[in-house]
């Protein structure tokens, strides 16, 4: 299945193993999710936050909530 969401911002942890994507949905709402990748796993990034279903009216609201719930992101 193709992804329909457009990533507006992708923020990587300093070690490169984690990231948070802030995205825009086709309906105009925003969301975010946290992802992890392991160097030994050729499948790439996978969701570990499971925040992707939460809906925000603005990109700024999604960013603020991501910073609140993703510990490493709030420490950058």
Regions found by a protein language model. Give the residues of each.
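A short, structured beta-strand/loop element
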Residues: 20-46
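Aromatic-enriched hydrophobic runs in primary sequence
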Residues: 18-20, 30, 69, 74
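Mixed-charge, Lys/Arg-enriched low-complexity segments
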Residues: 1-2, 40-76
